[in-house]
Amino acid sequence: ININFFKNRRLNLAKDMEDNSVLLLNSSSTILRNNDTTFPFRQDSNFYYLTGFEEPDSIMLLMSSGESILFCREKNPDLEKWDGFMFGLEGAKQEFHFDKTFDIKLADELIPTLIQGLSNLYSLIGKDTLFDNKLISWMSKANSMERHQENINLKDFSNTLGMKRLIKSNEEIELMRKSCEIAANAHINVMKNAKSGMTE
C-alpha cells in the first residue's frame, strides 16, 4: 500500500470532525511473555488504519485541520539488535507523512499543550482503560492552562471510525481479492495433493 494512502485516510477522517477538535489514538503495547521475551507484536487495527505505523508505544493526534502528529520511540541501535528495525522520529515523519513527530517520552509534557484551547477531544472511549485515564489527565492539565476558556469535551469516536472502515476503497478491494485468490489456490493445491491416511 502506498504510504500516501494512510495520509489520505487521515485527511478524509478529519472532515468528519467538528472544528477545533482533535482525535487521539494509541498503538498496541508489547505483551511480556516471560522475564525477557514478549509475544509477537500486532498493531491495533484502528491505529494501523490511520497511520500504517507498526511499532508499539506510539500515539497519534489528528487535528480537525488535517494536521497529524505522531509520538513514537526514538531510534535506538542497541534496542534494534533485539527488537528489529525502528523508524525513529525523522524516519517516521518522512515515511508516514506526519506533519510533526515527537519522542513518546515527552507525551505527558507536550500533549496538554497541543490540545490546549480545543473544543473537543475524540478517542475510542472504553477500549483501553489506562489510555482513557491518560486522556482525562491530559485534558485536566490543558483545561487548567485555559482558565477563561470552556473545558474540552471528551467524545467517543468509535462509531464514526467504524463506519469509515466499513467502506473499502478500490485499492483495499483489490488487495482483498488478491488475498482470497491466494487462499483459494492454496486450498485447491492441498486438495489435489491430499491422499487417504494423510495427517496435517
Residue ranges of predicted features:
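Short regulatory/linker helices and ligand/cofactor-binding micro-motifs at input modules
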Residues: 189-194
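A composition/biophysics-driven feature that prefers long, compositionally simple stretches
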Residues: 1-188
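Signal-transducing coiled-coil linker helices
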Residues: 195-200
